[in-house]
Structure formats: C-alpha cells, structure tokens
Regions:
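HIT superfamily nucleotide-processing domains
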Residues: 1-119
C-alpha cells in the first residue's frame, strides 16, 4: 500500500523543499541531498507508485514513456550523455529501496572504482 507521507510524496506536494532541476505535470527531477557522485539527480514520477513494478504495471504506457523520455532529456541537459552515467532504481527492501516511491538515481562524473593490477 502506498504511503502518502513518504518523503518524495511530500516533495512532490511542495511540503518539503528540494533543489529542482526540472518539473512538469508528470515528473520531478532534483538534486540528491546526499550525493554519491559529482552529479546525483533523483527522478520521480508524480503518481503514487511504490516501485518500478508498480509503476510499469499499473500506469498507462504514455505516463511511463514520458518519465523515461524526460530522463533522457535530463541526461542531455546535465551534459553527461557522451561521458557515461549510471541510472539506478532499487526495488523493495531486499533491493535496497529506502523510500517507498518509485524513483531513479542518475549518477554522473563518477570516479573510477576499478584498479589495474600489476601481474
């Protein structure tokens, strides 16, 4: 069951402030308050959906497509399209989801995490 008092629902309603990058009638993109990369943006659809499966299973394909199309536009706006980026969405407790509202993380300008081993 969807929790109307989750932090993203409050941000969408304007009850909690955020640093908005883009907003329209269906989506909101804003900076993460605890970034793990130089660019760390959260994207949320403005419909009451708990996770990815809830979003794609219970909402019109046009709403889902609009969200992902807008995600691509945000990636272009952030100028990370050519250099590489990550899109992450955790789902459920065992998937590491912390806020029970479907959202994505867009991470860019990350430091390399792999090491080259001398053999």
């Amino acid at each position: 069951m969807y929790d109307e008092n989750n932090i993203f629902a409050k941000i969408i309603r304007g009850e909690v402030p955020c640093k908005k990058l883009y907003e329209d009638e269906g989506v909101l993109f804003f900076n993460d308050i605890n970034p793990v990369a130089k660019i760390h943006v959260l994207g949320v659809p403005k419909v009451p959906c708990i996770d990815f499966s809830d979003f794609v299973s219970n909402y019109d394909i046009n709403i889902v497509a609009q969200f992902f199309k807008k995600t691509e536009e945000i990636i272009s706006m952030l100028r990370i399209k050519n250099d590489g980026y990550r899109i992450i969405s955790n789902s459920g407790i065992n998937g590491g989801q912390e806020v029970p509202h479907f959202h994505i993380h867009i991470l860019g300008l990350m430091q390399k995490t792999h090491q080259v081993l001398d053999v």
